[in-house]
Amino acid sequence: VMVPPGRSRSSRNGRRAEQEALAKAASDPNNPQSAEDIARQLEGVSDLVGTPGQEGAVDGTTTPTPEELAALAEEGALDQPIEPDPLRPAPLPGLDEEGSFGRIPRSADDGTTPFDAYKRPFDRVEGQPYVAIIVTGIGLNSTRTKAAIEDLPLNISLALSPYANNLQQVASDARAMGHEIFLQLPMEPIDFPLSDPGPRALLTSLPEGENLVRLEWLLARFPGYAGVVSYLGSKFGSLDSAIRPVIEFVDRTGLMYVEGTNSGSVSLGAQLASNADSPNAVGNIMIDEIPSRRQIDARLNDLVELAKSNGVAVGIAQSYPVTIQRLRNWSSRLARQGVQLAPVSALAKLQVTPQSADEAEAARRDAALAEERAQKDAAPSDTGDGESETIEN
């Protein structure tokens, strides 16, 4: 496949078609041209289409660089559809029970947990570095949801917002494609109410019983999820008295707990889950806190380096169009960097070391004292109790 030198430059669509034809040609085993030859031709066509790496102003799309196009050509990945690898329809018998607001997860009588039953099958190899990605906010926007389900690699996990409509259908579609799914748990952030986790969020101002009622409502939103992912929650998740009852409840349901809030710090929730021997993970890097091509690519590179250093790394992303595009591009080249993409469930219990019973009890006492001091510091000083100090001359 060659680029005719006299081709008109008036049609962007025609030039993009040339890009795609060249990329596909590189994956054709009968094509005599080398990948380098095709990369040079792609560079010429890319120059006609637009500035490499420049982001669109509206939809967050970018013009791929020649290097990216050549890499995609070698993989045969450009515009190749993801083939479904369906997971079993949910709910499965014996893995739910009636709650206050509908069916909620539970472990089966034979010991099978919802985590065991609903995670995506994956075999880890000892010594191989792995990265996992959770894309959040699924269900809130139908176009982005469709793109995430259909265009992302199946080993990328999807977290559904409890506030989305038609959640059972979204969950069914995601699992039918082959993605494992998680439920987002909205929790109070430090800057609440400036950052608003929504009307059913878990709040430090509520009594434990009310938060557990809200938790039941959240857990009943749809079936088939392998675990929960904290959303916001930088304040709620840092208070032992607030997060501990939630983790204990999640542990009883047999679900995985993923800390999706603290950008790499070992959260109290993940530590409590680890101490209970529940499956858990911690999001190390927020991939698209700044949703630009270059920033996303930089964060993904950081994630790969962290995986090479620590053995595993977990990224948290949102379902922006540019994020989905960059994730697909990045994942097609990941194996060449010596790192494999895994579902987040496959990395359970690999990041947080369980505390001994003595360590856990000491941490609990320290947390209780810290909360008590914080409450005293926040309380107004009492100057109206009728007592007065004796002033000595």
Residues of each region from the PLM?
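Active-site mouth loops of central-metabolism enzymes
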Residues: Y130-G137, P199-G209, E289-I296
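Glycine-rich anion/phosphate-binding loops
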Residues: Y163-Q168, S205-V213
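A short, acidic, amphipathic alpha-helical segment used as a generic capping/interface helix at domain edges
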Residues: Q295-S309
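Hydrophobic faces of well-ordered beta-strands that scaffold small-molecule active sites
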Residues: V131-V135, I156-L160, I181-L185, V228-S230, ...
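Active-site beta->alpha N-cap acidic-glycine motif
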Residues: D110-S195
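C-terminal domain-boundary segment and adjacent tail
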Residues: V250-S265, G269, S319-E392
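Juxtamembrane proline-rich low-complexity "stalk" or linker regions positioned immediately after a signal peptide
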Residues: M2-R106
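Catalytic domains of cell-wall/extracellular-matrix polysaccharide-remodeling enzymes
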Residues: E208-D297, Q318-A335, V339
